[in-house]
Each structure stands twice: as structure tokens, then as C-alpha cells.
């Protein structure tokens, strides 16, 4: 049986949060990776906000 809408969102929020946390805690010195992490933080946070809004509508 597949994962439903709500279960999917509830699993993805911590997954995205983990990516943000890894970027913030990593000892990154490569400028390209630093830039990538900034993009990851911005996009993943926006997606977390969107998923929370969708969950709130259920």
C-alpha cells in the first residue's frame, strides 16, 4: 500500500529540515558548495512552508 498525501507531507518535512540542518552544520569551505547550500536552505524552507500550509488545510 502506498503512502497517502498526509503521510507523505509529514515524512518530507523532517527530510527537508535535515538537509537544511546539514548545510548549516557542515564545515564547508568550497565556495560553490556554500552557494549550493544557500540555495538548498532557501528552496527547502519554502517547500516546508508550503507543505505545512497544505497540512493545515486537511
Question: What name fits each language-model region?
Answer:
Residues 1-58:
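His/Met- and acidic-residue-enriched segments that coordinate or traffic transition-metal cofactors
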Amino acid at each position: 500500500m502506498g503512502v497517502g498525501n498526509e503521510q507523505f507531507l509529514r515524512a518530507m518535512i523532517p527530510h527537508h529540515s535535515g538537509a537544511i540542518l546539514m548545510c548549516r552544520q557542515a564545515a564547508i569551505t568550497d565556495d560553490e558548495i556554500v552557494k549550493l547550500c544557500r540555495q538548498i536552505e532557501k528552496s527547502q524552507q519554502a517547500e516546508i512552508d508550503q507543505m505545512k500550509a497544505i497540512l493545515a488545510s486537511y
